[in-house]
Amino acid sequence: MDGMAPDSVTIRKMLQPLRPRGPDDEGVWQQGPLQFGHRRLSILDLSERGHQPMVDSELAFTIVFNGTIYNFRELREELKGLGYHFTSTGDTEVILKSFHAWGQACVERFAGMFAFALWDQRAKQLHLVRDRMGIKPLYWTQDGKRLLFASTLPALLAAGGVDTQFDPLALHHHFSLHAVVPAPRTLFREVHKMEPAHWKTIHADGLTEQHRYWSLTAQRPVEAKSEWEWAEAGRESLMQA
């Protein structure tokens, strides 16, 4: 946040606790005051083309992504029809192209569990995004000099210099809600969880914007459904899930 280039030691420290979760590959990328790190568990594209942080030089986007987009193949075909070309076979690149094609509305097309950070070089904006139900975690903390984020709390704390004063209300939640602390709180006062179904944008000047892109609705259908129709709707939902 102070415009200074981050040191490489900090990001390496943060990546160390992630090794068991991502044993297949490690990557670090830096541009000016911004630095991304990633530990990879290869599942879809097993080649080096799926390496992260993934950089799209043509679109000027860089991403670190944790999760799975289940309908990425369908989205990739749709994007190909719009003229986009792909160099990898996984879902990470689909997120990059989708953001370029549809902007922040792209997340409404994603079926899956995900948390990602995307840097838009031209707009000088960092986007932090979490899936609808908050299946994939994303922690962050910010002071006057830096913004840190990670997919696990140990990785975030490994950076050092993070304020770890306990949050009394979060402790109350922890002991009364079976060890659950609802987002955006964590046990630590200055460490936060991205809320499910939220999109946060941090501008180069430090201005931050956040909005909820989805909410669960429970509404009665306009027309009554038969037992068979309800069963078919349930089957369709299960198949999609």
Go through the PLM ranges and name each one.
Residues 1-241:
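Cysteine-centered catalytic environments shared across enzyme families
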